[in-house]
Amino acid sequence: HGNTCPVMLSSSAQASLSGRFEGSVYGESKLAGEGLFREYSERTGAPVLIYRFPNLYGKWCRPRYNSAVATFCDAIANGRPYTVNDPSVELELLYIDDLVDEMLGALLGEEHRCGYDGLERVEGDDFCFVPETDMKSLGEIVYLLGCFRDSRETLSVPDLAEGSFSKKLWSTFLSYYEPGNFAYGLKPNIDDRGSFTEFLRTPERGQLSINVSRPGITKGNHWHMSKWERFLVVSGTASIKLRKVGEDTEGNPFPVDEYVVSGSDMRAVEMIPGYTHS
């Protein structure tokens, strides 16, 4: 009927029939589908967008079906058994949000085009692709997921750099916790002065802790050579005092710098290196 509306085919990397996909019946069926779409394009003049998607992953993907990442996420998050036959096997991984971004671009005629030489992407326009993919081994994936699971004990925060594989896998992993398992306990250190509880730790940006002080209690009275801290009172009122270590040119102690802060008027106070603080 003269309809030349563009059509998109969700094919698979297995259609290359290369490497470990050689002889894949599933790949052969996808390759046959690509051929039918090309014939349709030649017959009608309708543009065809053929995407050979690699391994997709993202929140709520069905485990124990056709996604290794989903299977590992579900098993490791919920204490189920799993098997890694060969940790060295590498997968090209495509995050679902990146796929959606590409599909929205394709609707606007902004798809990314390429050719293929086996599994290798080359210059060309016979196919479409999503630029944001990651090559990771099964061993790397399982190791990261184990770190994510253990983070409730270690309090560590993974690499959450924008666009990083770690951030995408972390968001995916969290979605596999079952309802009722979203909360976990912390370990407060309690004494007569109050309590100190670590909440988060990062390898490059320090940690976040909750410090509860009883009325009239003084904590601190020490200083650091290079360590830096930032205090924020969220409940009650506190007097935070700092004094530069050493003496001035006349041999007198440096003056005390005092900040009275409260939970009703939140202000962050820097614990400057080289200053005693309490």
Q: What residue ranges belong to the model's regions?
A:
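Glycine- and acidic-residue-biased ligand/ion/polar-headgroup-sensing regions
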Residues: 226-248
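Short acidic-glycine-tyrosine-enriched beta hairpin
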Residues: 246-278
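NAD(P)-dependent short-chain dehydrogenase/reductase
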Residues: 35-91, 96-109
